[in-house]
């Protein structure tokens, strides 16, 4: 029986860290890989690559824990989140705080194997990961903070590989923020009615009936910035083909969200994984050739 309880607790931790739902980690991973490949240029040193891949999964898990901790009093009132480990009592608040600290310490131990510039930048990464979940109480733009949190691995990657943060780094960081606002607005459209009832703020609420148009504008801006990054770094035609495919995926997402159906909006959000993957493949093939 004791073993069963332990197994149940581990399963609850597993759900709290969202290791059963990798989409968030993938949306964090792709921009990290973009940055590593552009900074190298090409295949980065294998240890640095391993540190960042492991760091992505650890910090995404930590972000999910602190997000659920921040939302623990709200999640019970939302149908989609009512059964999460914290509001359902499967994990205590103390256990969640302890798990967050363990994950952050493990991630920081990995960062300590890198250069000083990267270590210093990692402090901002922790601050963004902690602050983001609480922003939805105070501003309609928490998605901007999410974009900064998900994108902070970009300057860290450039710093780790080249000990510099050039213009391409910050353009990529900006592109990631715009992309995150677009895809997380799609995600927020799923919960918009519930969020309005409990007082949670989001860009989906802020944009209102202009949500689809603004998402489209953001997506076009992302593609334009990626083209500029390609030009600055002398990338080959393979990369520009990937930008075109990403544009087609964005068009497909626009089709999905046209009626603002919850399931379709969530499907559009998930589709962004392929956008990140396609752009990474374009970068990798461009440097390979």
Swiss-Prot record:
Membrane-related topology note: Multi-pass membrane protein
PROSITE patterns: UBIA
One GO CC term on file: plasma membrane
EC number: 2.5.1.39
Statement: the UniProt record of this protein carries the keyword Cell membrane: yes
Catalytic activity: all-trans-octaprenyl diphosphate + 4-hydroxybenzoate = 4-hydroxy-3-(all-trans-octaprenyl)benzoate + diphosphate
Disulfide bonds: none
The protein's annotated pathway: Cofactor biosynthesis; ubiquinone biosynthesis
Keywords assigned by UniProt, alphabetized: Cell inner membrane, Cell membrane, Magnesium, Membrane, Transferase, Transmembrane, Transmembrane helix, Ubiquinone biosynthesis
Gene Ontology molecular function, alphabetical: 4-hydroxybenzoate polyprenyltransferase activity
TM annotation in the entry: 33-53, 99-119, 141-161, 163-183, 213-233, 238-258, 268-288
Keyword Magnesium among UniProt keywords: yes
Biological process, per Gene Ontology: ubiquinone biosynthetic process
Swiss-Prot/TrEMBL cofactor(s): Mg(2+)
Cellular localisation: Cell inner membrane
Family matches, as InterPro entries: HB_polyprenyltransferase-like (IPR006370), Prenyltransferase (IPR039653), UbiA_prenyltransferase (IPR000537), UbiA_prenylTrfase_CS (IPR030470), UbiA_sf (IPR044878)
PANTHER family the UniProt entry points to: 4-HYDROXYBENZOATE POLYPRENYLTRANSFERASE, MITOCHONDRIAL (PTHR11048:SF28), PRENYLTRANSFERASES (PTHR11048)
Family: Belongs to the UbiA prenyltransferase family.
Function: Catalyzes the prenylation of para-hydroxybenzoate (PHB) with an all-trans polyprenyl group. Mediates the second step in the final reaction sequence of ubiquinone-8 (UQ-8) biosynthesis, which is the condensation of the polyisoprenoid side chain with PHB, generating the first membrane-bound Q intermediate 3-octaprenyl-4-hydroxybenzoate.
Protein name as it appears in the record: 4-hydroxybenzoate octaprenyltransferase
